[in-house]
Amino acid sequence: MGSESQGNQTDAQKDRDLFKATLPFGIESVKTSWWVVGSTFLLLLGALFGAALAPAWPIRLLFSVLSALLMVRAFIMYHDYMHNAILSRSRPAWWLFRLYSALALTPPRSWQKSHNFHHGHVGKIDAPSIGAFALMTTDMWREASFAKRVAYRVERHPLTVLGGYFTIFFLSVTLLPFLRNPSRHWDSLLVLLGHGTLIATLWILGGFDVAFYVVLLPMTIASAIGSYLFFAQHSFEDMHVLPTDTWTSRRAALESSSYLKLNKVMRWFTGNIGYHHIHHLNVRIPFYRLPEAMAAVPALQSPVTITLSLKDIRACFKCCLWDEGLQRMVSYREFTRAAAAV
């Protein structure tokens, strides 16, 4: 009993010490925040105008792809704003990000509630899949009904992840919360109306091609990138899923969240979200200070690392179930083979 208590105290102390080490980086520079937000949204606006007005479709396509990448970067800023990491007291930022939420299909009430739950429960074996992709253990899978297995496989299927514009942002983040609780998630209706009105207006004024290149295509690409980044950073080969009694915020950050190693260009477009283990440790660190925190805190410098290589992407999608006996993620095929061998 005494040794168990001492171990828990040690874990608690480690949590406090590591969190304390990150505190200096949780202080934003308002000037820097406005620079990165302002420049990103101006570039996004310019790219969207290019996608709408360029004289030839190949140029419009390039502008549309650029818009998608800038949408990803803008989303990270919206995400940081919702965590109160940047510009939390700014009224202009409040309006800017509310308008952006309609383009990105991310109503503030639904997003903030589910995402905060995710931060408080990521990596827990028995946590509900709120704000995250569902995760079953092999024991849960063994006991699950056929219908539950089908729903689980559909939710974690690559097409569901890559079709995130419809499956994640339209359905899970926006429409379903409103249908479940209209009075609480009234802003989801505003987001749906705003998003639909934007598409309809562009279609009426400029034709389907304008709506396609300005909203439909870039949102499809940006949502696929964003959904995969979120999936991969909590579903990878060397991750750990922890029982509630041994779960701590530090272990969730370092063992259940990955570091996505990217080149400088993709780090810029993804707003340093690859430093996900640090973000989960301290959500108040602005995205532009995450590399600084990693460089300064030795305990953050040996994370589980993944990349965007095809090998790593395939490996992430093969991480389907948590095997408590093996203490690792396994594929459906591995589970079936192991079950047949018993």
Regions found by a protein language model. Give the residues of each.
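Histidine-centered catalytic micro-motifs
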Residues: 74-83, 111-123, 229-238, 269-285
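Membrane-interfacial segments at transmembrane helix termini in multi-pass membrane proteins
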Residues: 227-265, 308
